[in-house]
């Protein structure tokens, strides 16, 4: 599961608070159904092995969270889409999906990017050297200790016997289907402004949507077994 450049959702409620643990941390995850909502309670601890944190690219340690997420139980596809950054969904183990980073091109910053950089050029974590300390699950840890996925949660999907891996904030199911690729592709040539140089995937703006009838849509969604 990997999203490029544009992520769209229509509803997301999140509350998390870091909790210090003095015992072994175990995954806790529950799903409850309300009239029109599907709600998730989680401590944010994955049910699979993780990389070592802190590490060279990420100074944060994993800590238990208090996560409460509700999404529409009966989602409807809208005629309009909303571009967002940040958390876009939750996996079926209670770990959150957050593909985008908080970094933007900043030639004055030591690393060449910062939270206060040029908003026209947002950093793609998979194009960065060191990938900000991502582990083998394409995940790392935020400042508050929240372990979260930026791409395909390898350790999680390897233990599944189904394609359904989670829910997006708009209520639609998230599936991992082997061989299915995003329709966002890398541009040819060189950037004409901003961080001059070849389009190399360092920034989300290095990609464009190349759609066709056999590819998923601009929101990385599509039909699967009769459902969007």
Residues covered by each model-derived region:
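Short, Lys/Arg-enriched N-terminal segments with co-localized hydrophobic residues
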Residues: 1-2
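Sec/Tat signal peptide C-region and signal peptidase I cleavage site
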Residues: 19-23
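Sec-dependent N-terminal signal peptides
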Residues: 7-17
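Short, low-complexity cationic-aromatic patches
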Residues: 61, 132-145, 210-227
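Extracellular/lumenal glycan-associated surfaces
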Residues: 92-98, 143-157, 225-228
């Amino acid at each position: 599961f990997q999203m490029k450049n544009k992520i769209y959702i229509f509803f997301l409620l999140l509350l998390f608070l870091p909790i210090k643990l003095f015992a072994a941390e175990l995954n806790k995850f529950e799903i409850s159904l309300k009239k029109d909502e599907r709600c998730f309670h989680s401590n944010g601890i994955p049910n699979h092995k993780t990389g070592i944190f802190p590490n060279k690219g990420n100074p944060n340690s994993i800590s238990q969270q208090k996560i409460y997420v509700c999404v529409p139980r009966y989602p409807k596809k809208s005629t309009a889409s909303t571009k967002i950054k940040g958390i876009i969904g939750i996996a079926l183990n209670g770990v959150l999906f957050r593909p985008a980073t908080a970094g933007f091109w900043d030639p004055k910053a030591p690393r060449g990017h910062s939270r206060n950089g040029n908003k026209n050029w947002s950093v793609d974590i998979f194009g960065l050297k060191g990938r900000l300390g991502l582990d083998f699950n394409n995940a790392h840890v935020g400042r508050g200790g929240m372990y979260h996925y930026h791409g395909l949660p390898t350790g999680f999907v390897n233990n599944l016997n189904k394609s359904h891996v989670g829910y997006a904030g708009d209520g639609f199911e998230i599936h991992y289907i082997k061989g299915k690729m995003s329709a966002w592709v890398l541009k040819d040539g060189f950037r004409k402004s901003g961080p001059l140089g070849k389009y190399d995937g360092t920034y989300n703006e290095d990609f464009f949507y190349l759609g066709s009838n056999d590819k998923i849509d601009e929101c990385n969604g599509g039909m699967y077994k009769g459902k969007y």
